[in-house]
């Protein structure tokens, strides 16, 4: 099909210009129709001629582009027909077929004629043209070095050996058989030769390529080459670049002459061709040059035919990421209009490499769409400013010229050279002003300047006013574009952050992150253990800092607001209950007890008792006997409020009995006193082992001490049995952790408090230290508690708090089954009518998990740190803490950056963080969309606000996860275990016990150790992997065969007679005499220290022994000090004399040796 389509256009091509190859120019040109006739020409003819020109100059694109430029100038009437003919003849000089083909398109009366072949002089060959031809050959055969080297070898053999020009042509014809254009161009460098090769020569017929009918280049017509080569030597190498007037100069001659001038050939030979055989005659002896490539100007010009953008500048010198130095052999073009100042300041060797969005090798941030808008505005502004400036400059020049004409400084009669008065920029401005008629106006200006200048000046001023108004109008548009896109243009990370954030917030991503960190840390520990011999470190895998405690309040308000707006009441209750009873106490946040009702009571007391201290009113009420019978330190009801940490449905007021109104009122008064003293005593919290204790704890602890009675049951140390054999002294309450049990006193004890005020609630020693105490007493209590009074913080829990009174196993099992079957009517109410907090309800179903732990533990295993809280959890609870940390980190980032921007000198906003929180609330309740929220964040915080764009998704995911944790059975058990472990005394809390209990719950699941330090406000999370926390399996039974080997062979006793000698006899004789071997043994072991700590494992199946790492035996003896001798004794005098004599001999030998060396010196 392709062949058919080609034949369709044969007829138009035959009517159009017929173009032959460059090789035909040396022979008889083909018949070309033309000579000034334009009849029958079509667009196909013009395209065919253009294609022929393009194919002819496929290695020289500049000529083709120059030809197109000539045609464009002719179309624009910049040049006439004669000018076109002159430029085309000069451009296509030597290409007769193209010149004759161009006649077809000339009008009548115009024709390009050629000189007869005999009279036409030989085209001079330029050295630069020869170099370009060699480079084209090298570029054409870039993938085949063999062909290029073969071509160089042919030239070298022609220069050095007996090879005629005929043979050179035949070999080059074989080499360029598929590249007729190169072969035709090679002929131009050869001298005229005749009679050497016949057309009927078999070699020539075999190598001649038949021409395709549509091929632009016909087959080459060989000629006979037989002529003496004339060479002329020049003193300077630069003269070789000039055009040669001698037609016999060729490529081979230039190559040889160039090498000769550079001193590569010591004796330059004269080459003569006699009867077809070249004879080399050397003036001073000639040696074969080993490497023709030593001439850099000829063969090493790798960059001659390459543009700068095609150069590989990777290995070149680098100044900045954008600038590279050109290679030393790259030709530098000589500027036309450079003066001395330009020579000093302008750069010719450093070029700017491609960078930015087009080149990804240079890591440069790509422009976003908002930056593109700003850049377009800048381009428009620049263009308009340039237009206005060019018009203003042209107006000044035209006015100046008109003034000279009007003043007769310049005569109108004489022709005016416009270019002497107007610059090229001014003329280009005038030409652009008139558009398509610009050239006509320029011609008229040159011919009649005094007439055209006033009209042009008026037009310039009109255009100046028009463009000035346009710029004023566009400035409003540009200002809107800048205001709309400025902040967005600075944000390059939000797009990628949004894509990655969903993966980072997933449970799978968070777990994979800490696993990867833990594995890397384990490998580093192993390498460190091998290199240094240290034991693996048990430091957290990840750590997070909570520097701003006020952010916890913002988080609470945020979660509470979201739950009220989105979640149902039941879900909201569970989420907020978990928040205020577990998460906040874990981070050391004080208990939130302020409510709306309490604030109302404060207002009433302030109105009725202006002159009485609120603490005295509370004291009188608490000391009233009528109030003692109803003494129940209950938690006041919580109402929904943004300032209140509890929400409706999550308070414990709904679990209270109906007849507890007086107790509620009593607690209100307690809270009133705490609130009224809040300003005068801002620090109401004192640090204990795991948290901060409120000041009213001692009151409740003493009340509970009364309720304990004699319910103490002894148990083994370390045994975990909270329901049956729990030693009550091992547990205490910490209010900050939400672990405050509220106990109802037995009736007999309440009556005792009424009759015996010294031991009751209002007694002198056992008085309840409530928040209603006077300010001075309150300060003293705070001071005592801060000094570490341990008794002020203990609250001993009765046996009923752990599931009832101490009973037998049957009763315990019965009670347990009854609770499991029927449940409890009120989850907050105990069996004896007492009420429990959230943590106490966790403690009720707790049972012993690990059977037994060692009774004696090392001190390091006991958590004695008073400022940290430890929690063991699973994947779900780890993700909960990570989501909390991410939310905290982003809110803190917003607070920091907003405050930083507010403190900036150019800032006008004084409450940026509040504005941000309002925008976030609007986003959560749906009154604002994400786009508006992002714009407000960028305006408030700046470019760092990209991390806040997904806050709504993070809050939503966090609340869902909180609800999932509250509803999950395994997570609930872990929370119960945490509450149970936190009831221990400081000296009775063991990390290893807690860990084993958690492992008993989770089995093969991942266990995370989460620890928060209040002193450092640091949260550390460690994945307890199998290599650092898996307890070793203890063997229960031993196989009989292995037991026999272990007892009879490995641990067998060897008698003294069978033992080999451990000491040499001569050494034993020094320490003991005959019959005193035991005495000698004891003397030998004096001062010797032996430490046996090597451990090993023995495989029962193979009896192989494996020594444990980091264990070893050590034997060493301390160096004994020399005994001080008596200086006056005879033995000491004798010893000192001998030592002095020995010292003098050594000195004498040293001087003798030194003298000998000095004498031997020259």
From Swiss-Prot:
UniProt biased composition (Polar residues): 18-30, 1123-1139
Function, as annotated: Acts as a transcriptional repressor. Plays roles in regulating gene expression and genome stability.
Protein name, per record: Paired amphipathic helix protein Sin3-like 5
Gene Ontology terms: cellular component: nucleus
Provenance organism: Arabidopsis thaliana
PANTHER family, per database record: PAIRED AMPHIPATHIC HELIX PROTEIN SIN3-LIKE 5 (PTHR12346:SF31), SIN3B-RELATED (PTHR12346)
Entry keywords, A to Z: Nucleus, Phosphoprotein, Repeat, Repressor, Transcription, Transcription regulation
Domain PAH stretches: 28-109, 123-193
Gene Ontology molecular function, alphabetical: transcription corepressor activity
Signal in keyword set: no
Span list, region Disordered: 1-37, 702-727, 743-779, 803-830, 1121-1143
One Pfam entry name: PAH
Primary localisation category: nucleus
Modified residues (Phosphoserine): 817
Compartments reported by the entry: Nucleus
